[in-house]
Amino acid sequence: MCKSLRYCFSHCLYLAMTRLEEVNREVNMHSSVRYLGYLARFNLLVAICLGLYVRWEKTANSLILVIFILGLFVLGIASILYYYFSMEAASLSLSNLWFGFLLGLLCFLDNSSFKSDVKEETTKYLLLTSIVLRILCALVERLSGYVRHRPTLLTTVEFLELVGFAIASTTMLVERSLSVILLVMALAMLIIDLRMKSFLAIPNLIIFSVLLFFSSLETPQNPIAFACFFICLITDPFLDIYFSGLSVTERWKPFLYRGRICRRLSVVFTGMIELTFFTLSAFKLRDTHLWYFVIPGFSIFGIFWMICHIIFLLTLWGFHTKLNDCHKVYINHRADNNSLDRIMASKGMRHFCLISEQLVFFSLLATAILGAVSWQPTNGIFLSMFLIVLPLESMAHGLFHELGNCLGGTSVGYAIVIPTNFCSPDGQPTLLPPEHVQELNLRSTGMLNAIQRFFAYHMIETYGCDYSTSGLSFDTLHSKLKAFLELRTVDGPRHDTYVLYYSGHTHGSGEWALAGGDILRLDTLLEWWREKNGSFCSRLIIILDSENSTPWVKEVRKINDQYVAVQGAELAKTVDIEEADPPQLGDFTRDWVEYNCNSTNNICWTEKGRTVKAMYGVSKRWSDYTLHLPTGSDVAKHWMLHFPRITYPLVHLANWLCGLNLFWMCKACFRCLKRLKMSWFLPTVLDTGQGFKLVKS
């Protein structure tokens, strides 16, 4: 008896200690990453303090000493608010504002007379170290999965540091200060552009970086400090271009879900910025040195710019009008769990966005041409406004481009559930013992309900949900799948996406086990798909909740000629029954449907110790997939419906330029990069563009 009690006690103690060690390892890793961020912040604080001390020591300016002491006092107050009053938001806001302000002072105070001073050199190395630590911390956080991406345009930290930096620029002359304030606004626009993953965000980043150190931009006296400020702010949105798994509508949620008046005012604000840029461009007419080139060029391209931007503003206004109609439907049908993106698709927003993308491209082209004709390398305000307008128009282009690519795709789904848990020695399904029938029926019914919920939530047309306890014969499955794969929309074209769900017995190599000893291979299914799909560009997404889905996930990656994806699951072979229940078929379906149908879910696919792990694979051409594009007649009808008659001649120019495919080389490179990403760096979460996502653990 004593031995049994001692054994039980020692066993329980061992389990508790093992679990404690695992938790400690996870906590220690998270703490290490957090401390790395603290180290980068502390290193930056030391660099700022040392730099300001050097400037006070060499210039004997008492104002620097007052600001320095006041800064330390404010940071002390922030620490007291954080640790003693638990006012974390107020404390962090105060400290971030002062970090930006003090770093701005370090940038703008003249250091030309003591650049070779040892303390000044130490400050530079500390700033460079801060840059490295900041990049390393952000990268490790994302590789470890500790960052939870949320929809936002600018974070509070970014906004306050930008404001603090802009306030510090007021220590200079008015014209130089205005140039820097506009440059800070341009940096904010660039951060938003990167976070929204706009199509032209990376070129904008390159242009901004190249122009950043022009003397006409009033680049601060300390370029290392300014580079530290710029890189520390740009690191997170730049890395999130790859690491963020948010869908298009999730990324743009702060804008799309904004109030009607705010969105209308944003169009007015955009018009004011564009008009200011045009006015500053007109200052080039004062240059009499090249009047024979400037005056005709500005007259021609200025008129072209005006017409394009009238169309640009009317396009934005029309977009918000259609978005307001979608919001009315969304508010009236919120109880039905209809998301805004599905309502936008039903309202024809995709067609509008695809045409608007071409029109906004003209605005970008006109801005680039006018900027080149009116180039003023000695006017920092002009260059700063140019850097504001570019990402602003790039965001509009990116919004229309991404909404046009992700909205409006029609889809149809078919589910097959064969609840077979026990197999004969030759691998064929057999009838279950009576005591297991009720449990299996409940689990199978749960799978059917889950997949029907999935189809209904994402507005996927349901072809059928077949449930068979005795299995399906090859001929029966053949006829059903062929009928499913040849389905078309009411208007006649094929559906954009076909979703096939299967849960049942499979062989070790992934084939579906059918009644009568037959099997269904992936090659056979793809042969049927090619026969029905023909020259169309539809997609096939196969969802497997079976014990052997890995072979199909690997095999689909070798397909070259079709757009096919396989979402599978891997059940843990050995599980400690004292910590978790053994995984069963249906567990993956439950979690995956909950993940895709509940935006507030707490499911983490990369969590350690999961008994059901997700995996997916896509064909080589998956990233090349695009929906049907509008024709020239579609563009002409849209133009006559939304724009004044005076702009009609641009219809032919629009169709001609779009037919040229000016970005064919960029698109080819972009396509190669996307293929490389999907083959070598497969994302943890892949947005299908239909509202649901494929995931891997």
Curated annotation (Swiss-Prot):
GO cellular component terms attached to this protein's record: nuclear membrane
Record-linked InterPro entries: TMEM168
Primary location class: nucleus
Compartments where found: Nucleus membrane
TM ranges: 36-56, 63-83, 89-109, 172-192, 199-219, 223-243, 265-285, 293-313, 352-372, 380-400, 646-666
GO biological process: regulation of ubiquitin-dependent protein catabolic process
GO molecular function, one term: sodium channel regulator activity
Transcription regulation keyword on record: no
Membrane topology category: Multi-pass membrane protein
CDD domains assigned: TMEM168
Residues the record marks as carrying a glycan: 111, 337, 533, 598
Keywords from the named record: Glycoprotein, Membrane, Nucleus, Transmembrane, Transmembrane helix
Coiled-coil spans in chain: none
Function: Plays a key role in maintaining the cardiac electrical stability by modulating cell surface expression of SCN5A. May play a role i the modulation of anxiety behavior by regulating GABAergic neuronal system in the nucleus accumbens.
Protein family: Belongs to the TMEM168 family.
The protein's name in its UniProt record: Transmembrane protein 168
Species whose genome carries this gene: Rattus norvegicus
Lineage: Eukaryota, Metazoa, Chordata, Craniata, Vertebrata
Gene expressing this chain: Tmem168
